Amino acid sequence: MDVNPTLLFLKVPAQNAISTTFPYTGDPPYSHGTGTGYTMDTVNRTHQYSEKGKWTTNTETGAPQLNPIDGPLPEDNEPSGYAQTDCVLEAMAFLEESHPGIFENSCLETMEVVQQTRVDRLTQGRQTYDWTLNRNQPAATALANTIEVFRSNGLTANESGRLIDFLKDVMESMDKEEMEITTHFQRKRRVRDNMTKKMVTQRTIGKKKQRVNKRSYLIRALTLNTMTKDAERGKLKRRAIATPGMQIRGFVYFVETLARSICEKLEQSGLPVGGNEKKAKLANVVRKMMTNSQDTELSFTITGDNTKWNENQNPRMFLAMITYITKNQPEWFRNVLSIAPIMFSNKMARLGKGYMFESKSMKLRTQIPAEMLASIDLKYFNESTRKKIEKIRPLLIDGTASLSPGMMMGMFNMLSTVLGVSILNLGQKRYTKTTYWWDGLQSSDDFALIVNAPNHEGIQAGVDRFYRTCKLVGINMSKKKSYINRTGTFEFTSFFYRYGFVANFSMELPSFGVSGINESADMSIGVTVIKNNMINNDLGPATAQMALQLFIKDYRYTYRCHRGDTQIQTRRSFELKKLWEQTRSKAGLLVSDGGPNLYNIRNLHIPEVCLKWELMDEDYQGRLCNPLNPFVSHKEIESVNNAVVMPAHGPAKSMEYDAVATTHSWIPKRNRSILNTSQRGILEDEQMYQKCCNLFEKFFPSSSYRRPVGISSMVEAMVSRARIDARIDFESGRIKKEEFAEIMKICSTIEELRRQK
């Protein structure tokens, strides 16, 4: 979608134009090939930042580990990970002193969550490292595989469906001398294709049992798989991100629940809120500093940037924080929460796919898997790769690298925010005991620092003190990348503040346009995005009207549904013209059927079908909203659907839009090519899982959805629910006697089959 940039500048104050300098139009860069190099960079850098720490060897896995905690105090400005335990604990104590009862209350809230969370919480989330197959899988499949393996190894606590019981199994699994797992393998054979008479390779999937000893199992359980982060704008170099396995995820979830609960109570925390709520929270802190800096005081703000936040954090520090936060709590609770940081202190980073070599002269390509990097002759690699491999070799075990210091990206966002806020908290006058004082905002690794003092020397002293205090807990403020301004102008988490937050509209640009789900959803999402931007992002009426016209144009080109009376020829125009001519009320045709656009900025909240319903010919209504229409594989749609929109910053957001089911709400069929690959068995498992969940949710509409607890299985729950519903429907006259009898018969048959099984 082309937007003429000059139109944007007609009446825009200069500071609002900041957003046009963002690299957010066009396609974002994606990574290709292997992430092995990026992962080695991360591992090597992390060790370099902590190089003066103490080396030890893990007695269970034999992995060499570097511990920088309480290491030497830094003498220069280089980033370092030498956090001092007593400093972290003191910062926690002061945080508690200024917020009485905060840790206590958060622990109570978390304890309640721990006792109620079901294990299916772990099915949320995208790709997950599946330790049974040693590669990434969708979260639900990885969880199912893990539970299946646990069950076949005699671990059954998780049958009750509580997450805490699954975690008990995880702990027990680590004590077992060996584990038996099922892995997939593929056989290839050449067969003649009946149709084309050519030879083709046919792949079949087998499952085989394999025994894993304690050491190998522990390595897998502690492994984080790595991938390259895609679609990152404004960077030349790609970087690696990690995805943990199922053993770690549950423990991390509880730690983050506790930290989230603390963050919600801290006014300086930019997490877990977002959007307008976050802006209001931030504006409060700024207002406080500006009103308190009376005429006698200066107030400056640093737009802060930290050097390699994750790689200088340390799981051992997080353990110290948790130990402090949960003091006086029951032993079991403290144990559950301390496991995540302990596992992270012993984590292993999987190096990914390895390297691809090709010989131009011989037209040969070969994959060097990560497992071989420990032993292969380095003469095949270029200079920089050779250096990386040499450096990482002492750390390698079975294609994974021991990575004790550092936290991989995105694992403990909430807890690290608590650490950051605890340093901001130390800026109160009662702690600094001088004329300067500070406050600020923290959101994961991003921060803004507001310093007040009677003169410039005081400001400088305040900044220096903040900088040095951060160093003591392993936070490295970058002097090169942070900049200071009079309070009133700064940037924080891509929000630009200039006497109030300026809408950074360019961030939303990627979400304008046609999503490509289907005609019905795309129309609805398109107008909802425009509506939301009018509400939240200062999208003015004239620009919104222009955006709407561009969207409709874009939509018509995408689905080739130009108006019935247009001159444009496409492969759909013949059908659409015919429909146009035989329709009495042409205004009633949907845009996707060649109708006119009736949207303007006043009615964006109404789904198109509803907007045009009164204008439609009766037979058109009948065809459009007919669930028995044989040409449509129909998808049942609740009144509200969720679309994934891509804002420019951060992860894809989920956005609600109104969904009215019509014959345009089709679902494209799955690409067949996956059916011939090694993923096929997994795909079938996944579909089975999906079908069961969908069926279950049909019986328990979300309003009355208490998951069955205790011994009853999903099937029993559904059968008993069906009987209750049928009786109510029969007694109220909604179903006939024969239908009631048939339902009862089916229920009995199902129970009979279960008994025979």
Curated annotation (Swiss-Prot):
Q: GO MF annotations for this entry?
A: nucleotide binding; RNA binding; RNA-directed RNA polymerase activity
Q: Where is the composition biased (Polar residues)?
A: 55-64
- Occurrences of domain RdRp catalytic (ranges): 286-483
Q: Which HAMAP family match?
A: INFV_RDRP
Q: Which organism is it from?
A: Influenza A virus (strain A/Hong Kong/1/1968 H3N2)
Q: What is the annotated localization of this protein?
A: Host nucleus; Host cytoplasm
Output a single Gene Ontology CC term carried by this record: host cell cytoplasm
Keywords for the protein's UniProt record, in alphabetical order: Eukaryotic host gene expression shutoff by virus, Eukaryotic host transcription shutoff by virus, Host cytoplasm, Host gene expression shutoff by virus, Host nucleus, Host-virus interaction, Inhibition of host RNA polymerase II by virus, Nucleotide-binding, Nucleotidyltransferase, Phosphoprotein, RNA-directed RNA polymerase, Transferase, Viral RNA replication, Viral transcription
Enzyme kind, highest EC tier: transferase
Functionally, this protein is described as follows: RNA-dependent RNA polymerase which is responsible for replication and transcription of virus RNA segments. The transcription of viral mRNAs occurs by a unique mechanism called cap-snatching. 5' methylated caps of cellular mRNAs are cleaved after 10-13 nucleotides by PA. In turn, these short capped RNAs are used as primers by PB1 for transcription of viral mRNAs. During virus replication, PB1 initiates RNA synthesis and copy vRNA into complementary RNA (cRNA) which in turn serves as a template for the production of more vRNAs.
Q: Which gene encodes it?
A: PB1
Q: Report the protein name in the record.
A: RNA-directed RNA polymerase catalytic subunit
